[in-house]
Amino acid sequence: MKFFIDTANINEIKEANALGVLAGVTTNPSLVAKEGVDFHERIREICNVVEGPVSAEVISLEADKMIEEGKELAKIAPNVVVKVPMTTEGLKAVKAFSDLGIRTNVTLVFSAVQALLAARAGATYVSPFLGRLDDIGHNGMDLIRQIAEIFAIHGIETEIIAASVRHSVHVTDAALNGAHIATIPANVIASLVKHPLTDQGIEKFLADWEKTQEK
């Protein structure tokens, strides 16, 4: 499973990229708005930092306007992926983008049949939202597993991005259940590195080393 970071903050992206594990970036209008910067310029900045896919989301809800927006976003850099909501109009736009050779990430997926529809429309990626399903008492991992099984049975190459990741258990379970990618906030990426036994082990090694130096 590959790791993407879910942010529009350049410093967070650079820090994650320095770890050597970052394969891509996902953004959304809320994340960019939080940064208080020009949307297109920030996507361009991100694409200059990361070589992998960078998802940039359309704002419009009508297919023709989504297509116009997506074409402009795709011009920013070759690694831009146009992010489209899972709606009837979104599917129309995804088909058009597929015909144009523009990669897409269908977001706000909450059922396996939505993922299948997106894949058949030509989506490069589908993004089921784990945390938001958990919030309403549903099991997001069941959804990941269902999508992975359906795609495997039917030979579908669309990749599954586990989104709305809240903690390290989401990451582990997504990997076990067939997600190709997890897109993760910076704070969760930082938590993945840490384990109390690792810290204890380092402290013990250092303490033992200090003892040898005292002799």
Curated annotation (Swiss-Prot):
A single Gene Ontology CC term: cytoplasm
Active site: K83 (schiff-base intermediate with substrate)
Domain of life from the UniProt record: Bacteria
Transmembrane residue ranges: none
This protein's pathway: Carbohydrate degradation; pentose phosphate pathway; D-glyceraldehyde 3-phosphate and beta-D-fructose 6-phosphate from D-ribose 5-phosphate and D-xylulose 5-phosphate (non-oxidative stage): step 2/3
Compartment list: Cytoplasm
Signal peptide: none
Catalytic activity reported: D-sedoheptulose 7-phosphate + D-glyceraldehyde 3-phosphate = D-erythrose 4-phosphate + beta-D-fructose 6-phosphate
Annotated keywords: Cytoplasm, Pentose shunt, Schiff base, Transferase
InterPro entries the record matches: Aldolase_TIM (IPR013785), TAL/FSA (IPR001585), Transaldolase_3B (IPR022999), Transaldolase_3B/F6P_aldolase (IPR004731), Transaldolase_AS (IPR018225), TSA/FSA_arc/bac (IPR033919)
Pfam families noted in UniProt: TAL_FSA
Enzyme Commission number, as recorded: 2.2.1.2
Residue ranges of coiled coil: none
Example of a GO biological process term: pentose-phosphate shunt
Chief location bin: cytoplasm
GO molecular function per UniProt: aldehyde-lyase activity; transaldolase activity
Purpose of the protein: Transaldolase is important for the balance of metabolites in the pentose-phosphate pathway.
Homology family: Belongs to the transaldolase family. Type 3B subfamily.
Name of the featured protein: Probable transaldolase 1
Name of the encoding gene: tal1
